[in-house]
Amino acid sequence: MSANTGKPARHYLISYPRTASNLLLKILALDSQPNFSSGGFDGGYFFMPADDILTDPRIRVRARSISDWTADERAQLKETFQACFEAQQRWLESAESQGQSVFVKEHTVFFADPTARSCLQFGPSATSEPAWTVEYAGGSTHSKLNITVLPDEFLLTWLPTFLIRHPALAFPSLYRTVIKREGKESAAADNFASLLTTVEWSRSLYDFYVQNRESLPCSPDQRLEWPIVLDADDIIAHPATVTLYCDKIGMDPRQLCFNWDQLKSEELSKIEPNQLAMRMSLYQSTGIDTSKSSRGINVDDEATKWRSEFGIAVADHIEKLVRGAMADYEYLRARRLRAD
């Protein structure tokens, strides 16, 4: 139950790839949290099927602006976004009918409006097409800061948490996983654009929720606490922050898990390859690895390492993305939840 209203609450963990979201879910031990449900694929990702189409290397939609998509491609994607949304709706109704609060994670890239995606990837003049919005009985408003396919009215039924991580750690980490999945040649050929690793969308949604605090589903005296921002550094180095967060969202801090068993080789062999590529370090761990924090990191030094690891062209592109994301990251970091 929500600590604020006494009713089942909807908690949205909004992130970008490689922000230690799987580590956070591991620590929260959602399966052990009373009166909480976390569904979809691995705690959420209801809109992953749409992203799978957008990033399918066979049809190369990800390499083209929305203005160059065929009618069939548009229809397929619109149908998929709607199907994802309806699946999420059915799951929500089931969980809430049992009196359970929900905790769901989603990467911004998974439920991003394709017009916003094209403008980010190809420039603001890539399309003047109106934003895509799924059909929802509760409303169809789509304001400027809302970069998702979800209408404002639906977003405002959730209490949002934004998970961030230093771009100089998150961005190259994501590129490494793409190499593991697709090979270096394919990843490089796409010039990293397919990853759409951006903090801009998280900031935009954060500002959307700040502007609409009065409409959030919590008691008036709690609204200034939302939206919440968590930095991966604090999850890694300051467990008290997770305990505080747990208390704020109505979870039981006694269920938090900071140590676990390493997966055995036979267990790893049963895991889907793409999932292994994204989570191998977590599966092989027995607890939090404090070396994963950004403490003392220097972008100039990291860029030198990237050139050695990825080659000059890819490294320069990653560096450009990292430097371009720092203002949004620092903006959100300054507003993060802290236990001290």
Curated annotation (Swiss-Prot):
Keywords: Transferase
GO molecular function annotations of the record: transferase activity
Keyword Transport: no
Key word Signal present: no
EC number of this enzyme: 2.8.2.-
Pathway where it operates: Secondary metabolite biosynthesis
Chain segments annotated as coiled-coil in the UniProt record: none
Gene3D superfamilies registered for this protein in UniProt: P-loop containing nucleotide triphosphate hydrolases
InterPro entries, per database record: P-loop_NTPase, Pyrrolopyrazine_biosynth_F
Function, in words: Sulfotransferase; part of the gene cluster that mediates the biosynthesis of pyrrolopyrazines, secondary metabolites showing insecticidal activity. The role of ppzF within the pathway has still to be determined. The single multifunctional NRPS ppzA is sufficient to produce peramine via condensation of 1-pyrroline-5-carboxylate and arginine, N-methylation of the alpha-amino group of arginine and reduction of the thioester and the cyclization to form an iminium ion resulting in release from the peptide synthetase.
Name of the protein in question: Sulfotransferase ppzF
